Amino acid sequence: MKLVVAAVLAMAASRWRRLSAHGQVPSSTCADMLPVHGNAMPSTALPYTITVSPTSVNGGDTVRVHISGTEEFRGVYLQRGGAKSSRRVPAARRREQQDRPVRLPAGHNNAFSYISRTPLDTLDIDWKAPYTSDEIVFRATFVKSFSEFWVGVESPKITLGPLRQLDNAVAA
């Protein structure tokens, strides 16, 4: 009897460790955005899109990033980067409990992930623009299932700036 209880507890502990790791984006994904699934990307047409509104903002403004698909997805990993390069810069903030900001090696909350066993066909993320002049895009990896994922899906370009002066500036 003790052996059976010990075996059940060992299996439960093993399952708990696997479940606690679920929902985490591995740090290796930050560089190439590839999920650690060991499979090739699908050759089927991309069923997902990223739209942004508005596409021209000033620092402090909010951009709605809308992720949608003709098929449901179980995960998305989103990074904000320069429009002319793959450079990563700070990104999105949380909207739902299953959403989480991700810390990449070069910064804090500069990527976003959603991972769930409950599939979605849309997800909205509000992003607050920094006080800078730049052109950026969002790049995403979509995971439909363990063996089906698409990498490098890009949003339309967003123009940031020009820099605004403070509204409450003191006149000299």
Curated annotation (Swiss-Prot):
Pfam families: Reeler. Keywords: Antibiotic, Antimicrobial, Immunity, Innate immunity, Secreted, Signal. One of its GO terms (cellular component) is membrane. Residues 1-21 form the signal peptide. In adults, in hemolymph. Its main location: secreted. It comes from the Eukaryota. Residues 22-172 form the Reelin domain. InterPro entries: Ferric-chelate_Red/DefProt, Reeler_dom, Reeler_sf. PROSITE patterns: REELIN (PS51019). Induction: Its synthesis is positively regulated by juvenile hormone. The keyword Signal applies. Gene3D superfamilies: Reeler domain. One of its GO terms (biological process) is defense response to bacterium. It is found in: Secreted. May have antimicrobial activity. Belongs to the insect defense protein family. This is Putative defense protein. It comes from Locusta migratoria. The lineage of its organism: Eukaryota, Metazoa, Ecdysozoa, Arthropoda, Hexapoda.
